[in-house]
């Protein structure tokens, strides 16, 4: 099946060890409706020899029922897994696929192109390192191209590959490729991606997807797969500012007290002097414990347990940073917010805000402006609707550690949770922390006020505070 099938058959331990050492690249495909996103992923899997024979046979059978490619196998059916997607020939939900080559491991997020699924795309893009934006060579840059480029930029994706697809339908015209390239360059001036690539391709026939095509002799660049295998992403991670959100306090016996979590950014070493926020108490890292034994240092992405030389008060939701860090606490911040609920957002309504492992009540105090993701124009709004993106002022009841999202994606992101249904209704990216303000109580629902009164009446020993 794959490039490593022989190694799997002869030495599974060697294969697993080699696979574990490979660097992981997460990327998403996005573009206008029917630009060929799912077909491109199917082509990547097919040409990388990552499809089993029975899968290929099933797709060949489904092509006669749902396919849109005539006599050719519709590789998009490898990815469009929902029955509604196959019947409509579109992508609705974010579809994830996993594959690897000799050089890297990959997780692909195939995101929907329709405007009503903007929230789905934002979800898929939030963990990606690279975006593949497809453009139909016949139509050029479309409204949805602008929207997806803006969302990719907003969510901190630094590497963008503009895949100008269906070049076979314009006879692999170099002038058409250059025209679309210039049009996108004009668009990207306001988005400032760190790295931008352009590839002419035909996902249906495989031109410049995995292998360089003979039908584009005028193109001297890399194929899409070559770009995916070689793009430099290690430097994208914040290795300077140590951030460790505490997820769990591990106390199996009286002789051990460790703080479990995943290093969000930076590096920590045994002997480093650290500080716990919000308390501000300091101590020294005594040991770094993992399932496989103790480490001398831990870096971004590693799940570890820290033990400290001193008994200081740390609980779930606290943040451990280096002692000399100038990180400040704030209960007020300015942020981009993607609204994901059918119920509109009005300033002043109480929600829960989750930053890493920290959860605190708060409100959106003000909507500064809404961004039209199709034109990039700004407008004043009194409420946010489903799929809206706006810059807002958030006020929290407790102070939190937050970094600018563009500087640190792990500690600059947050989600908004409905207090009654526990459903995630928004995703936020911090722009900057503002000076702390007096904690705001927000607007409570009639049910919350009545429940609070009931608790205070019948359970006075709980010391519940009056609300509303």
Swiss-Prot record:
GO terms for biological process: hydrogen sulfide biosynthetic process; sulfate assimilation. Keywords: ATP-binding, GTP-binding, Nucleotide-binding, Nucleotidyltransferase, Transferase. Residues 110-113 are annotated as: G3. Its EC number is 2.7.7.4. This is Sulfate adenylyltransferase subunit 1. GO terms for molecular function: ATP binding; GTP binding; GTPase activity; guanosine tetraphosphate binding; sulfate adenylyltransferase (ATP) activity. It catalyses: sulfate + ATP + H(+) = adenosine 5'-phosphosulfate + diphosphate. The gene is cysN. Belongs to the TRAFAC class translation factor GTPase superfamily. Classic translation factor GTPase family. CysN/NodQ subfamily. It comes from Teredinibacter turnerae (strain ATCC 39867 / T7901). It holds the Pfam family GTP_EFTU_D2. SUPFAM superfamilies: EF-Tu/eEF-1alpha/eIF2-gamma C-terminal domain, P-loop containing nucleoside triphosphate hydrolases, Translation proteins. Residues 165-168 are annotated as: G4. GTP binds at residues 31-38, 110-114, 165-168. Residues 202-204 are annotated as: G5.
């Amino acid at each position: 099946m794959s490039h490593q099938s022989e190694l799997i058959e002869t030495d599974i331990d060697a294969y697993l060890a080699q696979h574990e050492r490979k660097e992981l690249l997460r990327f998403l495909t996005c573009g206008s409706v029917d630009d060929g996103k799912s077909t491109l992923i199917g082509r990547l899997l097919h040409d990388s020899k990552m499809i089993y024979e029975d899968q290929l046979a099933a797709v060949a059978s489904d092509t006669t029922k749902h396919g849109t490619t005539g006599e050719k196998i519709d590789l998009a059916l490898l990815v469009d897994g929902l029955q509604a997607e196959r019947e409509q020939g579109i992508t609705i939900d974010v579809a994830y696929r996993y594959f690897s080559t000799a050089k890297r491991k990959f997780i692909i997020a195939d995101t929907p192109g329709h405007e009503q699924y903007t929230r789905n795309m934002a979800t898929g893009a939030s963990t990606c390192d690279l975006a593949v934006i497809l453009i139909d060579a016949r139509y050029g840059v479309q409204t949805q191209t602008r929207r997806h480029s803006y969302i990719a930029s907003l969510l901190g994706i630094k590497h963008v590959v503009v895949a100008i697809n269906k070049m076979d339908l314009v006879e692999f015209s170099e002038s058409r490729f250059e025209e679309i390239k210039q049009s996108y360059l004009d668009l990207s001036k306001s988005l400032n991606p760190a790295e931008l690539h352009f590839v002419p391709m035909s996902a249906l026939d495989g031109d410049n997807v995995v292998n360089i095509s003979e039908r584009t002799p005028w193109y001297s660049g890399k194929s899409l797969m070559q770009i995916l295998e070689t793009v430099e992403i290690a430097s994208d991670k914040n290795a300077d500012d140590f951030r460790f959100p505490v997820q769990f306090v591990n106390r199996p016996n009286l002789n051990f007290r460790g703080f479990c979590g995943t290093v969000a950014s930076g590096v920590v070493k045994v002997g480093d002097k650290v500080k716990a926020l919000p308390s501000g108490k300091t101590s020294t890292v005594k040991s770094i414990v993992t399932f496989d034994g103790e480490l001398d240092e831990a870096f971004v992405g590693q799940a570890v347990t820290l033990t400290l030389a001193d008994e200081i008060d740390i609980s779930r939701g606290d943040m451990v940073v280096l002692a000399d860090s100038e990180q400040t606490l704030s209960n007020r911040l300015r942020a981009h917010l993607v609204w994901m609920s059918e119920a509109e957002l009005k300033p002043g309504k109480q929600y829960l805000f989750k930053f890493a492992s920290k959860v605190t009540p708060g409100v959106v105090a003000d909507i500064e402006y809404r961004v039209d993701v199709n034109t990039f124009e700004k407008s004043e709004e009194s409420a946010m609707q489903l799929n809206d993106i706006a810059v807002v002022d958030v006020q929290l009841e407790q102070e939190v550690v937050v970094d600018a999202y563009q500087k640190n994606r792990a500690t600059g992101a947050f989600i908004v949770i409905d207090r009654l249904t526990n459903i995630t209704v928004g995703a936020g990216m911090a722009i900057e922390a503002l000076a702390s303000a007096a904690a705001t109580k927000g607007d409570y629902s009639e049910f919350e006020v009545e429940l609070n009164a009931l608790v205070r009446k019948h359970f006075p020993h709980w010391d519940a505070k009056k609300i509303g």
